[in-house]
Amino acid sequence: MSRFFIVTWVRFRLNAIIPIALFISGTICVAQTRQTLDSGWEFYQGSVGSIWEIWRGDKATDNVTWTPVILPHCFNGRDSVDPDVRYYQGPGWYRTKISIKNPYTEGRTLLHFDGAGQKSRVFVGMKNVGEHNGGYDQWDVDITDAISKVDSQAALPVAVFCDNSRDSESIPSDLSDFNRYGGLYRHVSLVYCPQVSLQRIHIESAIGEGSNSIVKIRARLYNPTSYRDDIELSIKIQDGYGKTIHESNQKMSPWDDEKEVEVFNITDSKLWSPTSPHLYSCIAILKSKSGEGGLKERFGVRSLEWIEHGPFKLNAERLLLRGTHYHEDHAGVAAAVPDEVVRQTLKSMKEMGVNFVRLGHYQQAPLVLDLCDELGILAWEEIPWCRGGLGGDSYKQLCRDMQRNMIDQHFNHPSIILWGLGNENDWPGDFETFDKTAIRNFMGILNTQAHQLDPSRKTVIRRCDFCKDIPDIYSPSIWAGWYGGRYIEYKAALEKNIRDTPFFFHAEYGGDSHARRHSEDPEKFLGKVATGEGTAEVGKAYKADGGKARASKDGDWSESYMINLFDWHLKEQESMTNLTGAAMWIFKDFATPLRPENPVPRVNQKGVLERDGTPKESYYVFQSYWAEKPMLHIYGHTWPVRWGKSDEPKLVKCFSNCREVELFVNGVSAGAKLRDIAAYPASGLNWMVKLKEGTNFLRAIGKTGGAPIIDEIVFQYQTASWDKPDHLTLNEISREGDVVTVEAHAFDKAGTACLDASEVVRFGVTGNGRLLDNLGTSTGSRVLQLYNGCARIRIQCGHGGAMASVSNEKLETTFLKLQNSK
């Protein structure tokens, strides 16, 4: 975590005294005070004729309409998953007015951006004071000189232009399987700093003899006015409990570039690891005639070792990397993910048992890395050179700049163990020529720059076989059971790639699942899928049509199938002593422009959480293998109606890390079973039981050596078979205030529920009502496929009521009158 430490009491616009502390992450962002500028902004989506239009107010009658917004804010909070319209890519404007009260003599005033998409320009009044290209690295604009030209008694007018228009000469490519979002979707801050101040400190630690470690500190100044009087630098090191273990103080002259300013030893070092993420603090204070201030940087002491054709070691002990992936994307806000949601998401990762995350496919917000440090989650962070090929000089410079900024800004995070050079760079399409030699040469340039900036960490890429010898670590395409082959081929694919790749890691496995869709026979399609023909994603295998038989095209996209696939993958991973690790794709469903035909349109549904953070059943499969805290989960909490013949044995699975689980079916014990992690399915915790027509009650009791753990589910069992869907029903199932949840069901001519129906339905509303849609979830899209013959959506119902509807292109539209409860 990069954080300004010195707290200065500053009076801002409010009539209150508030303490401000700065997270430093930008290119030149250094200060002693920081005010986060989340409120007081207005937004306009579109272009203007000139900067004067931003400020002219009542001097014209045809002004554009401005909307009040709170930062972070994304252009595409709702339209990124609109089933009918592709998401907006173009210009947008933000404006605000800021009171300036810099407390430092000849101090500097900056605007700090944690990230803005994708190209940005900053204006103070009519003056363009700075520009930035790139949507993910942090950057700053020094507005000191511009302030002097504005009335000092008036609030400072600030406008920010953001543009996420398509541009093949920038990264990431629009061929990427995620949106290139626009807007001020990370925090913006007002920063004050003295005339000369610390711009950055980099901390290197190495484990020495015994339990000692050696720490080196390098520092860089922000000194735009070439201040040359003597300065004083003091450094204090504290352990994770706040105890001071080292102090120093030295007077010196200002320096240029980066300089080593301190070397010292830590005796009896406490090592950073997933089980004990101990963080030290380095507090650096710089004093000058202009004032004093400093930085507080956290760091960890740990060692990394990648064994050739073998496992990964952390602190000289083998650690199987149990990983996932994370996109900055959330229902209703897109890239403007609130801090509390980020915290909850990373906490949910840790509770699942994750010890590794690949941050796909770009530099992420400071809070994400801070949480990885605190929770003990190792990380792979990469630049967004993703698909499309290789552009010209400006394209290459942007790649180099983004890599330089990422490593410079996130250097001190002990969680980061890999720097990613790119992703799927074998994917052509943005340029007339796809030159593999040029891509190889540029990949080598990035690899060299990464090692020059940070010799302590390895480099890595995923899926570009013609470049696999360039980075230190390589991750090939292995999608056993989804894009290629069957999941039972997974271990053989791993073993082959471990043999063929000196330093191997497996990033991306899994598949899509439509939340709430379950199946009694999820593998009935497997007879079509050939074995022995490879497990890689080839060509356009991500599309739902064309090519050879595969689960992504011929499967049912049920949670049931994905549970089987994940269960098998995890069983195999745990048995391989030479495996470095693997990371499933992905933790949460996310928006993508490439998949309009998915069950939830424009959503990549490979997450173990829905886009709003709701867990799917597969979350608990991972937890049963990885979590240390005792857990027990009967599969089927979101499966309200199962089906089959009378007296037909049905499979019940419990996912648990308890040593023994006993299952009760309608009050009668079906027996206790011991957990065996090498057994499949569910580590041996599975039973074939007979269910009765109507309501069934399952209860499982897990034994842990302490208090027992209990899980229960209630569901219906239907023995009647059904024909094709004939009609839809629509009913209100719950109400909270003025928000009504409605549920559609498909029935055949005889009135029997069609429990495997997967037709596309469309919800609508007229009158004084509003669909709570464009969320990209199984209950938050107006267009989606049925899951087990049903679908839900919420409707906000106003005074006078509304008329809800559900339709299918082959079935008659059904209506439901809704009344406001007030």
Q: Model features per residue range: what roles?
A:
Residues 149-151, 220-307:
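Extended acidic/polar, glycine-enriched regions
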Residues 294-299, 707-719, 812-821:
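Edge beta-strands of extracellular beta-sandwich domains
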Residues 32-49, 64-101, 112-116, 157-229, ...:
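Non-catalytic, glycine-rich low-complexity segments
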Residues 229-234, 275-280, 649-651, 657-659, ...:
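Short flexible loop/turn segments that cap and initiate beta-strands
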Residues 72-100, 104-113, 117-125, 130-131, ...:
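Active-site-adjacent substrate/metal-binding segments within catalytic domains
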Residues 217-221, 652-656, 732, 738-754, ...:
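Beta-strand-rich structural segments
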Residues 37, 44-47, 89-200, 224-225, ...:
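Accessory beta-strand-rich segments of carbohydrate-active enzymes
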Residues 218, 346-349, 356-614, 618, ...:
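Substrate-binding/catalytic cleft of secreted carbohydrate-active enzymes
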